[in-house]
Amino acid sequence: MSETFTEISPHQAWELIENEGATLADIRDGRRYAYSHPQDAFHLTNESYGRFLDEVDYEEPVIVICYHGVSSRNTAQFLVEQGFDRVYSVKGGFDGWERSGLPIETAY
């Protein structure tokens, strides 16, 4: 089991999702998530954490994304401490994801 997470680019995150079925966990606030988020992202909050644990396998890769790639680091480290084996944080956060032209879902 890894003792820390790895920071990856938005494109590396997309490759993990496409090739290995990684779960992408968006930790931004509900309003921002509802407005737009990475395609198929799980909205991870204190309230949804129990469902996250039920749905996500500890051995599968988990990628955490936030606004700019800062607060996702804390959540990624927390998930490592909870026993998840392969945890990643997206450098640049959702801003970087969007600038990279990766798929998003929007309310508009």
Curated annotation (Swiss-Prot):
Role summary: Transferase that catalyzes the transfer of sulfur from thiosulfate to thiophilic acceptors such as cyanide or dithiols. May function in a CysM-independent thiosulfate assimilation pathway by catalyzing the conversion of thiosulfate to sulfite, which can then be used for L-cysteine biosynthesis.
SMART domains xref list: RHOD
UniProt-listed PANTHER family: FAD-DEPENDENT OXIDOREDUCTASE (PTHR43031), THIOSULFATE SULFURTRANSFERASE GLPE (PTHR43031:SF6)
GO-annotated molecular function: thiosulfate-cyanide sulfurtransferase activity
Alphabetized SUPFAM superfamilies for the sequence: Rhodanese/Cell cycle control phosphatase (SSF52821)
Keywords for the protein's UniProt record, in alphabetical order: Cytoplasm, Transferase
Domain Rhodanese: 18-106
EC id: 2.8.1.1
GO biological process: glycerol metabolic process
Family: Belongs to the GlpE family.
Domain of life: Bacteria
Main location: cytoplasm
Name of the molecule in the record: Thiosulfate sulfurtransferase GlpE
Keyword Amino-acid biosynthesis: no
Cellular compartment(s): Cytoplasm
Entry GO CC: cytoplasm
PROSITE patterns assigned to the protein according to its UniProt record, in alphabetical order: RHODANESE_3
InterPro entries reported for this sequence: GlpE_sulfurtransferase, Rhodanese-like_dom, Rhodanese-like_dom_sf, Thiosulf_sulfurTrfase
Catalytic reaction annotation: thiosulfate + hydrogen cyanide = thiocyanate + sulfite + 2 H(+); thiosulfate + [thioredoxin]-dithiol = [thioredoxin]-disulfide + hydrogen sulfide + sulfite + 2 H(+)
Transit peptide found in the keyword field: no
Species of provenance: Actinobacillus pleuropneumoniae serotype 3 (strain JL03)
